[in-house]
Amino acid sequence: MPKDKAVGIQVSQVSKQFGSFQAVKDVDLTVETGSLVALLGPSGSGKSTLLRLIAGLEQPDSGRIFLTGRDATNESVRDRQIGFVFQHYALFKHLTVRKNIAFGLELRKHTKEKVRARVEELLELVQLTGLGDRYPSQLSGGQRQRVALARALAVQPQVLLLDEPFGALDAKVRKDLRSWLRKLHDEVHVTTVFVTHDQEEAMEVADQIVVMNHGKVEQIGSPAEIYDNPATPFVMSFIGPVNVLPNSSHIFQAGGLDTPHPEVFLRPHDIEIAIDPIPETVPARIDRIVHLGWEVQAEVRLEDGQVLVAHLPRDRYRDLQLEPEQQVFVRPKQARSFPLNYSI
């Protein structure tokens, strides 16, 4: 049993199988008290199952789960003292915002004065002051999700679990709520785990990211660690855009990079484009230019037929004045290679 009081959640060798499908396999995870951790992975990676195991909504086939130092493996959902927010709000449609937030407090028989004070505090915290008498149907999707978060926080849970909380919202609202959630967490400091398949969301919000694939943890680290030092080919290819090339590609023939394994991963922003030949470049031709707003994407074709995607800042693109069919010279600034079939 963990003794460290700074540990909010400890998952030890947890596995879960549904029929013949191994949803979670031998997962170990430590979440520090007060931190915000993202479970990130594609569909079927096991991230939502792991969250439900922590919540007590599923029971592990093997392994132990500790919450704030105590063994909670066999505890009921109620006894775990968690707040849970689903993707689809799950608000009571017939209750006002204020009554939705108060629901858990009233179940616990708090006094009317205490309930009223806590609800008003939370309305201010989630920036919904003045909307307490509205019904969920009178709110936007983003506002409804804030109500769901306020309701989860009302009972002062030791752990807050969020299952793709912004997945049902449009892109602009999602981005606004990501920033808001980070600020909210910095105010309340509740140990929080949230599930997402959105790499940008995880990078922007989380203190630590747990990258999952096929029920296993591929890597745990800060957003910078995950991006700059991916532990496996899956992490490299899942976190951000990447070109995957054979190490025999012409772009590596000019030297300068160590690519000992057959497969090489090259980020689009790590490709340098020049108009004139410079050391360690190889000739290429522009296939296509795509304007992404904040940057420009250039698709370049090497002499061996390999097509690379490169990203350039807008000012660099303007300096180069790139056009389709133009001959250019390219070189990789850095790249990563892994042994074939490499995994942790």
UniProtKB/Swiss-Prot annotation:
InterPro entries: AAA+_ATPase, ABC_SmlMolc_Importer, ABC_transporter-like_ATP-bd, ABC_transporter-like_CS, Mo/tungstate-bd_C_term_dom, P-loop_NTPase, Sulph_transpt1, Transp-assoc_OB_typ1. Its main location: membrane. Disulfide bonds: none annotated. It is a peripheral membrane protein. CDD domains: ABC_CysA_sulfate_importer (cd03296). SMART domains: AAA. ATP binds at G41, P42, S43, G44, S45, G46, K47, S48. It is found in: Cell inner membrane. One of its GO terms (molecular function) is ATP hydrolysis activity. Its EC number is 7.3.2.3. GO terms for cellular component: ATP-binding cassette (ABC) transporter complex. Residues 9-239 form the ABC transporter domain. Pfam families: ABC_tran, TOBE. Induction: By sulfur deprivation. It catalyses: sulfate(out) + ATP + H2O = sulfate(in) + ADP + phosphate + H(+); thiosulfate(out) + ATP + H2O = thiosulfate(in) + ADP + phosphate + H(+). Keywords: ATP-binding, Cell inner membrane, Cell membrane, Membrane, Nucleotide-binding, Stress response, Sulfate transport, Translocase, Transport. Part of the ABC transporter complex CysAWTP involved in sulfate/thiosulfate import. Responsible for energy coupling to the transport system. Belongs to the ABC transporter superfamily. Sulfate/tungstate importer (TC 3.A.1.6) family. The complex is composed of two ATP-binding proteins (CysA), two transmembrane proteins (CysT and CysW) and a solute-binding protein (CysP). This is Sulfate/thiosulfate import ATP-binding protein CysA.
